[in-house]
């Protein structure tokens, strides 16, 4: 049964699509080995830092993920996927080297959050934009996005599990060596990546074709800069589907921003487990997310829409309530799996909708605009998360955040039906 579920993405993807899946899997696994344990875990367990320090780490990281995504989107639109990928690899290796070299003092860890955030934001187009450089067929795009999501979620299993063992055997900072190892493996996997150009109109430059690059490879700077951020912002907010999607993701993720700075304290003070469990419970979420991505792969085309996305986001909220609702690690494990299943459906749905709606020559920057809404929604709650935790308690604050995450998509489904129907007809 399980083998039949996984057979479709393996048999239907092109060689270049499989290579793209491997690139994303390896570079994302490196990130997953290091962020939660290497940054938040070091602050909470090794440095015994406060909620304010972890909130600052998440704030810095989210802000620089936003900045990195804008830089990455601009680089992709100007130079194409192959050069963008090489820059992503260089940035990841430089980040790991810097964090290892400068020690584990709180200030250094916060700087590490900045570097890691920028690097992750810069590399995000690998998952969100590269598929559109391989095909413009909606069904094939859904298959590629589901496969990317599925193996990205395998990263959430593999990365934190390996990171947990390394942290238990050595230290929480040692996980950055793993990040660098997986980055080198990603470079090897991506060495032969060649985007397709046959479905892109208006890019007949011979040198660009030989390089296999798309969108803005002309030597004329004014040509490569034609898809400005202002144009991409206008594209998002003048298209009913993209505008609604931006608002849905922003509002639905608003409550979720309280989780990152408080989760490590939930593990330490409520579940009463060690730092390695931060990796292992994250891996449980990855198991669920793989199953969710398989479900997304099996969705019929008529369900690839904003209503299905809202149902999946509401399920994220319900899973988060189960995750943080009790002091029992076994229940938290089940909650993480449920939460992962929901996220496994959300991500490929979101990416497919964007890729089939936005113009290819603006796709990198359009995804940066969409990512800004997502990440800014996570930044805003950081200002009050420490106060809420001090006033009501860590677990109570997380339960309240889970209720917000559940209620927002439910309200949008009930109150925004007319707008959703109009967007579906576009």
Q: What is the role of each PLM region?
A:
Residues 90-104, 314-327:
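C-terminal ends and interior cores of transmembrane alpha-helices
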Residues 2-63, 239-283:
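Helix-loop boundary and gating motifs at the non-cytosolic
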Residues 182-207, 414-426:
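Helix-loop junctions on the cytosolic side of multi-pass membrane transporters
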Residues 101-113, 324-335:
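Helix-loop junctions at membrane interfaces in 12-TM secondary transporters
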Residues 19-36, 61-74, 80-89, 112-168, ...:
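Substrate-agnostic recognition of the 12-TM MFS/MFS-like secondary transporter fold
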Residues 1-17, 196-246:
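Juxtamembrane intracellular "pre-TM" segments in multi-pass secondary transporters
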Residues 38-46, 158-179, 269-270, 380-398:
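Transmembrane alpha-helix termini and helix-breaking/packing motifs in multi-pass membrane transporters
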Residues 78-89, 301-313:
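Cytoplasmic membrane-interface "Motif A"-like loop-to-helix N-cap segments
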């Amino acid at each position: 049964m399980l083998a039949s579920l996984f057979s479709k993405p393996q048999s239907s993807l092109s060689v270049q699509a499989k290579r793209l899946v491997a690139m994303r899997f390896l570079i994302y696994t490196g990130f997953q080995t290091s962020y939660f344990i290497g940054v938040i875990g070091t602050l909470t367990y090794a440095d015994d830092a406060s909620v304010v320090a972890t909130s600052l780490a998440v704030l810095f990281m989210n802000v620089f993920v936003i900045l990195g995504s804008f830089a990455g989107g601009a680089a992709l639109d100007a130079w194409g996927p192959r050069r963008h990928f090489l820059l992503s690899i260089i940035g990841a290796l430089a980040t790991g080297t810097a964090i290892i070299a400068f020690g584990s003092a709180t200030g250094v860890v916060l700087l590490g959050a900045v570097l890691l955030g920028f690097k992750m934001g810069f590399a995000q187009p690998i998952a969100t934009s590269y598929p559109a450089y391989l095909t413009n067929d909606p069904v094939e795009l859904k298959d590629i996005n589901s496969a990317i999501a599925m193996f990205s979620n395998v990263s959430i299993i593999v990365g934190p599990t390996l990171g947990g063992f390394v942290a238990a055997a050595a230290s929480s900072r040692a996980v950055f060596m793993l990040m660098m190892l997986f980055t080198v493996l990603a470079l090897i996997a991506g060495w032969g990546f060649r985007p397709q150009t046959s479905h892109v109109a208006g890019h007949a430059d011979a040198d660009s074709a030989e390089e296999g690059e798309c969108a803005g490879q002309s030597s004329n700077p004014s040509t490569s800069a034609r898809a400005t951020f202002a144009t991409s912002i206008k594209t998002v907010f003048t298209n009913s589907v993209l505008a609604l999607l931006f608002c849905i993701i922003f509002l639905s993720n608003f409550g979720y921003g309280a989780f990152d700075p408080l989760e490590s304290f939930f593990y330490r003070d409520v579940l009463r487990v060690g730092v390695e469990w931060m990796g292992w419970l994250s891996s449980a979420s990855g198991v669920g997310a793989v199953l969710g991505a398989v479900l997304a792969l099996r969705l019929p085309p008529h369900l690839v829409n904003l209503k299905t996305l809202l149902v999946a986001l509401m399920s994220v909220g319900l899973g988060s309530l189960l995750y943080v609702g009790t002091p029992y690690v076994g229940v938290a494990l089940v909650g993480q799996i449920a939460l992962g299943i929901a996220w496994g459906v959300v991500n490929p749905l979101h990416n497919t909708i964007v890729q089939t709606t936005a113009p290819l020559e603006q796709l990198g920057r359009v995804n940066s605009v969409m990512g800004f809404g997502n990440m800014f929604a996570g930044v805003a709650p950081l200002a009050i998360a420490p106060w809420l935790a001090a006033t009501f308690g860590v677990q109570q604050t997380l339960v309240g955040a889970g209720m917000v995450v559940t209620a927002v998509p439910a309200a949008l489904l009930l109150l925004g039906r007319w707008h959703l129907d109009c967007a579906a007809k576009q």
